[in-house]
Amino acid sequence: MRTEYCGQLRLSHVGQQVTLCGWVNRRRDLGSLIFIDMRDREGIVQVFFDPDRADALKLASELRNEFCIQVTGTVRARDAKNVNADMATGEIEVLASSLTIINRADSLPLDANHINTEEARLKYRYLDLRRPEMAQRLKTRAKITSLVRRFMDDHGFLDIETPMLTKATPEGARDYLVPSRVHKGKFYALPQSPQLFKQLLMMSGFDRYYQIVKCFRDEDLRADRQPEFTQIDVETSFMTAPQVREVMEALVRHLWLEVKDVDLGDFPVMTFAEAERRYGSDKPDLRNPMELVDVADLLKSVEFAVFAGPANDPKGRVAALRVPGGAQLSRKQIDDYGNFVKIYGAKGLAYIKVNDRAKGLDGITSPVAKFLSTEIVEAILARTGAQNGDMIFFGADNKKVVADALGALRLKLGKDLSLTDEDKWAPLWVIDFPMFEDDGEGGLTAMHHPFTAPRDMTASELKAAPENAVANAYDMVINGYEVGGGSVRIHNGEMQQTVFGILGINEQEQREKFGFLLDALKYGTPPHAGLAFGLDRLTMLLTGTDNIRDVIAFPKTTAAACLMTEAPSFANQAALTELGIQVVKKAENN
């Protein structure tokens, strides 16, 4: 039906007769001439109808936005004065000789001239995807997956599929369950990741595996989360953690070079402890120049309990955050930031405005100045590198609250005051995470997952002091987003059972849930390690959007619903009966 795409026509096509298929993007009727912008997935081209082709001109008068049409015509060069430098096809136009209206369009529920609500865009997603910017994002996503496959193939990785219907395992989020008709009362789980299957593939001898795979997590959603998402899943045997990172870093550098024409350079490596200490986050945005600076040792003796208490508490912390040019902030803005940090558990926000360093205490403005000596103020200013016109905010509490509050404040200030370099790419690796964290109920939970190996510890050492264990894990972070994470896996049965025990999984439960894994570990398991990238998040970064729904063709809402198909929906009673399922309605509160 077509010979060319609209958006691919150039001066090299001048004089050629072409047939185009697509949609009316815009129509301009000048009486004796009608111009339309005709659009397909590759872009837009101007088509015009003149009186010499009367039948085509007459039919063109009926055209409206989003009519699906076929046009045959001749490519012509535009006059110099009519060249449109903003269009890829702006040097040419098509003189139509024939027009076919394939399908007409009703009045559109989306307005191309206004910003539509996200609800409307998701309900009429098939129309939203016609927009050039949406089409471009999905084309970029397709390019990324193609680049990934070629890279992995070139590096000896095998693309192997793993099951979608599997067994529920604890991985930190709720499973989506699928009832079995054959085995009534039993359920499959949709995989949160192919974690155990890819480890079993390593035990099977496939030493380099990858898969671009759908995963499912029934969890509360955020702007960058979806209930179903796509991973670039990778596992290797006989490779150390640095070797895995080297290959995966090369993959990401390849993507940025091919898609953005950007050389990311070598990725710095930072420990979890350093990232939390300097940036208050395990996924620091290094485009932001501000850092948290410890000042507890300077404040242990001050007669101000808000500072002195945490400064003298081994579990406490007092940190300062220097804000370049922050002295310009108004009292209302400061109060707003004080309320902001309370979201993260902080009780308030002490500060020092640096007006004139040379004047000591007389050169600052601070509600806590009366508790500080000239020597302490000068030491704080020196340690933070404060200059005239800067602001210093303080966090004083337990270590987690200080990191969370000042880390979030750092990001917000970076955006509000334009301190974060939005034109920069800042990748890094974060390594050496704690293996376990407090579950809030007196027990421990795995910070990554229960199959991650500890660094430099035997099973007996781990059992004796699990709180000291460091995971042989690594996350890739770009511009404050965790785009991938992985670890060296446990390849020893004793170590795996020890970890299960620390997590409160007794031997009977271990056999019920992971018996197949524990059995497999008995038969010559190789050392193995892997990683998974979030394809959706990578695409989000590479296309410059801040909403992950913009890079998924048919995404869910933050309530895990599809507004277009109205899923999820109620099942009919016959289907439920066949599955042996009874729906119990919650009693309404009186």
From Swiss-Prot:
Identify the residues that bind L-aspartate: E171, R217, H448, R489
NCBIfam families in the record: aspS_bact, PRK00476.1
What is one GO biological process annotated to this record? aspartyl-tRNA aminoacylation
Q: Where is this region: Aspartate?
A: 195-198
Q: How does it assemble?
A: Homodimer.
What is the source species?
Salmonella arizonae (strain ATCC BAA-731 / CDC346-86 / RSK2980)
What is the purpose of this protein?
Answer: Catalyzes the attachment of L-aspartate to tRNA(Asp) in a two-step reaction: L-aspartate is first activated by ATP to form Asp-AMP and then transferred to the acceptor end of tRNA(Asp).
Q: Name the PANTHER family on file.
A: ASPARTATE--TRNA LIGASE, MITOCHONDRIAL, ASPARTYL/LYSYL-TRNA SYNTHETASE
EC class, as a word, reads ligase
What is any one of the record's Gene Ontology cellular component terms? Answer: cytoplasm
Q: Its family?
A: Belongs to the class-II aminoacyl-tRNA synthetase family. Type 1 subfamily.
Compartment(s):
Cytoplasm
Keyword list, A-Z: Aminoacyl-tRNA synthetase, ATP-binding, Cytoplasm, Ligase, Nucleotide-binding, Protein biosynthesis
State the protein's name: Aspartate--tRNA ligase
Where does this protein hold ATP? R217, D218, E219, Q226, E482, G534, L535, D536, R537
According to UniProt, the reaction catalysed is: tRNA(Asp) + L-aspartate + ATP = L-aspartyl-tRNA(Asp) + AMP + diphosphate
Q: Which InterPro entries match?
A: Aa-tRNA-synt_II (IPR004364), aa-tRNA-synth_II (IPR006195), aa-tRNA-synth_II/BPL/LPL (IPR045864), Asp-tRNA-ligase_1 (IPR004524), Asp-tRNA-ligase_1_N (IPR047089), Asp/Asn-tRNA-synth_IIb (IPR002312), AspRS_core (IPR047090), GAD-like_sf (IPR004115)
Q: Which GO terms describe its molecular function?
A: aspartate-tRNA ligase activity; ATP binding; nucleic acid binding
Q: What is its EC number?
A: 6.1.1.12
Q: Pfam families, alphabetically?
A: GAD (PF02938), tRNA-synt_2 (PF00152), tRNA_anti-codon (PF01336)
